[in-house]
A protein has these predicted regions:
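Extracellular jelly-roll beta-sandwich "head" domains, especially the C-terminal globular C1q domain
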Residues: 1-143
């Protein structure tokens, strides 16, 4: 891939070049519960096998979602963060998240990642993805 990464079936990306990288992400969370909950997001990397990922120290960001506004209107948060990290060629990185109260859209109450198809009414706008992100090469490792 021309981007310097190969996307993997397990939602990780494998670096083609050793270096220092910056991941930037935006995650759309919803809370349909009557209580405040946290969404906790962090990076995991591996040593060339995407089957055993290790947590990246100091990569965690906590997003607090207030209680829902009403039974039909969840509380939304667009969580944004940037993390600088090191990868060797052949290593993979993935973005992970967890919460104290997981839910599904239209299912149990709690936190879930929110996506919305393109809309035409009452006004037209494109789809709202649950996650956006990019990985940027910052520099080679110091010699």
């Amino acid at each position: 891939a021309g981007s310097g990464f190969t996307l993997n079936a397990n939602n990780t990306a494998t670096a083609q070049v050793t270096g220092i990288y910056k991941i930037t992400y935006s995650l759309q969370f919803a809370n349909n519960d009557n209580a405040i909950h946290n969404a906790i997001v962090w990076l995991r990397v591996d040593g060339s096998s995407a089957t055993s990922l290790n947590d990246v120290p100091n990569s965690t960001t906590i997003f607090t979602l207030q209680a829902r506004k009403s039974a039909l209107l969840p509380n939304f948060v667009c969580g944004y963060s940037e993390v600088v990290f090191t990868l060797n060629a052949g290593e993979s990185v993935g973005l992970w998240w967890g919460t104290d109260q997981a839910a599904t859209s239209g299912g149990a109450t709690g936190i879930y990642m929110y996506a919305l198809a393109a809309q035409t009414s009452p006004m037209a706008y494109p789809a709202t993805p649950s996650a956006l992100g990019s990985i940027t090469f910052v520099s080679a490792l110091p010699s």
